[in-house]
From Swiss-Prot:
Record's bilayer topology term: Peripheral membrane protein
GO molecular function terms noted in the UniProt entry: 4 iron, 4 sulfur cluster binding; iron ion binding; NADH:ubiquinone reductase (non-electrogenic) activity; quinone binding
Top enzyme class: translocase
EC id: 7.1.1.-
Region described as Disordered: spans on this chain: 1-27
InterPro entries assigned: 4Fe4S_Fe-S-bd, 4Fe4S_Fe_S_CS, NADH_quinone_OxRdtase_chainI
Source species of the chain: Mycobacterium bovis (strain ATCC BAA-935 / AF2122/97)
Protein name in the entry: NADH-quinone oxidoreductase subunit I
């Protein structure tokens, strides 16, 4: 049986609208709200424009900007990449593919035992995080300030080794070629090899000639 002893709820009386919500005052408030909404727009109209004339005048980039990758060389032209694939393992987007190969005395591309025979970076996947350059043990891979990578062909955004290698300077020799006379791979890693050869050997030869 239903309980009929429950007290009845009090009747809610409708609250009449305030006189402040109607009439000229209400219309004036709405007008001020509309003007306030354009405050930011009106304030920006008189500020100095920040539009850049791109691509006619590209703006500067930050000092540590992560742009297109570059495979670096030693001063005599040998490649710094040793084909270790650490950059590919560190890439969270699986954008790097590396195949290493062995150097020989007849055909040497890098100072050590191995070099990167195949090197690809897929810029359709690359997120520019820079983890690959942090993983590189020889500083073979760095990132440049070049950010104009747009293309209308997807295949052209997969960069091969020839597009990633740093250009040869006039004092460099294109590999393959032997190491500097008397130099080891450690001398290259320590920066003791210049475009003319091994620094210590050249200095000792100069000292011997002066005697």
């Amino acid at each position: 049986m239903a309980n009929t002893d429950r007290p009845a709820l009090p009747h809610k009386r409708a609250v009449p609208p305030s006189r402040a919500d109607s009439g000229p005052r209400r219309r004036r408030t709405k007008l001020l709200d509309a003007v306030a909404g354009f405050g930011v727009t009106l304030g920006s109209m008189f500020k100095k424009t920040v539009t850049e004339e791109y691509p006619e005048r590209p703006g500067p980039v930050a000092a540590r900007y992560h742009g297109r990758h570059q495979l670096n060389r030693y001063p005599d032209g040998l490649e710094k990449c040793i084909g270790c694939e650490l950059c590919a393992w560190a890439c969270p987007a699986d954008a790097i593919y590396v195949e290493g190969a062995d150097n020989t005395e007849e055909e040497r591309f890098s100072p050590g035992e191995r070099y990167g025979r195949v090197y690809q970076i897929n810029y359709l996947r690359c997120i520019g995080c820079g983890l690959c350059i942090e993983a590189c043990p020889t500083r073979a891979l760095t990132m440049t300030y070049d950010y104009e990578l747009a293309d209308d062909n997807r295949a052209d955004l997969i960069y091969e080794k020839d597009r990633l290698l740093a250009p040869l300077l006039p004092e460099m020799a294109a590999p393959p070629h032997p190491r500097a006379p008397g130099a080891t791979d450690k001398d290259y890693y320590l920066g003791n090899v210049t475009a003319e050869g091994l620094r210590g050997v050249r200095e000792s030869q100069t000292t011997g000639d002066s005697r």
